Amino acid sequence: MAALRGYALPLLLGLLGGAVLLLAWPSPEADARPAQAVPATGFDGGVRWHNSLPLTLKQLRGQVVLVEFWTYTCSNCLNVAPYVHQWHARYAPQGLKVIGVHTPEFAHEGLPGNVRKAIARLDITWPVVQDNQYRIWNAWGNRFWAALYLLDRQGRVVYRHDGEGDYARTESEIQRLLASP
């Protein structure tokens, strides 16, 4: 009986923990949502730009912009990458500008040489800013790798998606924004 009690408490706590997790689990709609058309905050605080000179939102005004927060060892980011590549290839000629914000999760991910190698290995040709001190991350209120933000031609965040999935909806939002004046 004493041995049974030794198993019962951990089992009960595990079941309660699982129930709490299920209650707190976000709905499928929670990770993709239209934003309330708030002005984007920009890229101040980045330590280094790759594939471009530093860019500002003022320079990007008039373009539809996809901002992707990522880091090169994140499996979610690596799973999102082929879609970002497709959107860049398909929609850049129509005016889509992709900007990567590389925010490292681990110290080695912040080394410029490692980021350059990852950009080359992943065949990233769009501008990428390194955000080693999380200044851009925090200014945007970001919390996830990967996170996608779509900006309209006025520089306002009008759509956001956290994590993987819902690629058709994100692409539909890109198309909608590109069709808008």
Regions found by a protein language model. Give the residues of each.
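N-terminal Sec-pathway targeting helices
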Residues: 1-13
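Bacterial N-terminal signal peptides
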Residues: 12-22
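N-terminal "domain-start" segment that seeds a small globular fold
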Residues: 26-57
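Signature tryptophan residues that serve as conserved aromatic anchors
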Residues: 49, 70, 87, 137-140
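Short active-site neighborhood of thiol/selenol oxidoreductases, capturing the structured segment around
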Residues: 55-78, 84, 98
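Thiol/disulfide oxidoreductase modules built on the thioredoxin-like
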Residues: 63, 120-126, 130-175
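Structural microenvironment flanking redox-active thiols in thiol-disulfide oxidoreductases
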Residues: 78-122, 132-138
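Short, solvent-exposed cationic patches
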Residues: 176-181
